[in-house]
Design a protein with these regions (language model features):
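Helix-to-beta-strand junctions that scaffold the AdoMet/dcAdoMet cofactor pocket
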Residues: 42-43, 139-141
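Polybasic, low-complexity RNA-engagement segments
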Residues: 208-211, 216-371
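Conserved class I S-adenosyl-L-methionine
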Residues: 21-30
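Conserved SAM-binding loop of SAM-dependent methyltransferases across substrates and taxa
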Residues: 31-44
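Mobile active-site "lid"/loop adjacent to the S-adenosyl-L-methionine
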Residues: 56, 92-133, 150-157, 180
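A short acidic, Gly/Pro-enriched loop at the edge of an enzyme's catalytic core
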Residues: 19-20, 84-97
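S-adenosyl-L-methionine
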Residues: 51-89
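Class I S-adenosyl-L-methionine
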Residues: 91, 144-147, 152-263
Length: 371
């Protein structure tokens, strides 16, 4: 239902204007707080591709977006610079929360000072410049790019902005809606309008140090990123039977069965080959010996009224904790049909169970269970 973030860190995803139906790229996304806000703005439309260069962080990113029930997703584990040519002019919006020297976080975590001594602004500035150019190249004409860091370094902030504007003349800075505590970027007399960028200082706002700049790409785009499909897809009977028990909206043409796992992929997703993909689309579940078992991710993507058999527990019911720990629970006091059951808490889906004679066999994902 919510993701706790440091106040200043909430600013980038809040400032980037997302419209329903957009194709969005979160380039340096782990652990996923910004991706969840971007996905919330999309409201299960369009596509969000969320990426991290670290494999372990990308897997943590996947869990966070699946916890939030994001169906229209693709999670990558790529060097964002290396895939720029694959997604040239593809995205309506790009968010770059760039790796940085972290000067704005020293007050919160003084261990970062030692990391800064090892790799400071000079180290990160070159990485940032490559990333910001790649982000601009992946943006459609008329699209918007948000660049942010959690550092005070002018080399990593305003100088990165100047690097983009100098090397991509079709990009320009645009104004960010004022907010109490925002400060202007450090301007120069070179005509780059750096006052349109925003600096956040901890003595002016209840958060740590941050820098945010919003760009727009010249031109207008009339092309769709949707990929065409041909013909109709016949679903296995056991899968169709389960999907018919839901009112979840989907296009069978985008059902993709890989070995035994069933995915609902996005009509916007580009060709997969050659990409390190952690997850492409919503994992619906798995086909096992003439039966279909729905996934944890599918449960999180549903609403209570989209499945025909629900157990809705109160948040104060001690069975909620027992369910989260993976225990079988007694549900004799509920009018729940036998078979697959969507377990909810105050109307919000939590996972699956299988009811047999008033005993709910626990199907909560093992890796998510409380110890």
């Amino acid at each position: 239902l919510y993701y706790i973030q440091e106040p200043s860190a909430m600013t980038p995803a809040n400032v980037l204007p997302i419209e329903e139906g957009d194709v969005v790229f979160d380039m340096c996304a782990a652990p996923g707080g910004k991706s969840t806000e971007l996905a919330a703005k999309l409201n299960k439309t369009g596509l969000i591709i969320t990426n991290d260069i670290s494999n372990s962080r990308a897997k943590a990113l996947l869990k966070n977006v699946e916890v939030f029930g994001v169906p229209n997703l693709c999670v990558l584990n790529e060097d964002p610079v290396g895939i720029a040519s694959r997604f040239s002019g593809f995205f309506d919006k790009v968010l770059i929360d760039a790796p940085c020297s972290g000067e704005g976080m020293f007050r919160k975590d003084n261990k970062l000072i030692k990391a800064w001594e090892k790799n400071g602004p000079e180290f990160y500035s070159q990485i940032q410049r490559n990333i910001i150019l790649a982000g601009a190249d992946m943006l459609k004409p008329g699209g918007k790019l948000l660049y942010s860091t959690c550092t005070f370094s002018k080399l990593e902030d305003e100088d990165s902005v100047i690097h983009l504007l100098t090397n991509r003349p079709d990009m320009h800075l645009i104004d960010i809606k004022p907010y109490e505590g925002f400060s202007h970027g450090f301007d120069t007399d070179e005509g780059y309008h750096l006052e349109k960028a925003v600096r956040i200082f901890p003595h002016k706002m209840p958060g740590e140090g941050h820098f945010v700049a919003l760009f727009e790409k010249d031109g207008e785009d009339y092309t769709s990123s949707k990929r065409p499909v041909s013909g109709k897809t016949k679903l296995p009977d056991e899968l169709k039977e389960f999907m018919d028990s839901t009112t979840f909206e989907y296009d069978p043409a985008y059902i993709n069965i890989r070995d035994t796992r069933v995915f609902l992929t996005s009509p916007y997703m580009a060709e997969e080959r050659g990409l390190r993909i952690i997850r492409n689309g919503l994992l619906l579940g798995e086909l096992k010996k003439n039966r279909f078992e729905p996934s944890q991710a599918f449960a999180m993507a549903l609403t209570k009224d989209q499945f025909n058999n629900c157990l809705d527990l109160s948040v104060s019911d001690d069975r909620v904790i027992r369910y989260l720990k993976g225990e079988t629970i007694d549900i004799d006091d509920f009018n729940v049909k036998s078979g697959w059951t969507l377990v909810c808490v105050d109307g919000y889906p939590l996972g699956w169970g299988k009811n047999a004679n008033g005993q709910l066999k626990n199907k909560y994902l093992a890796g998510w269970r409380w110890m």
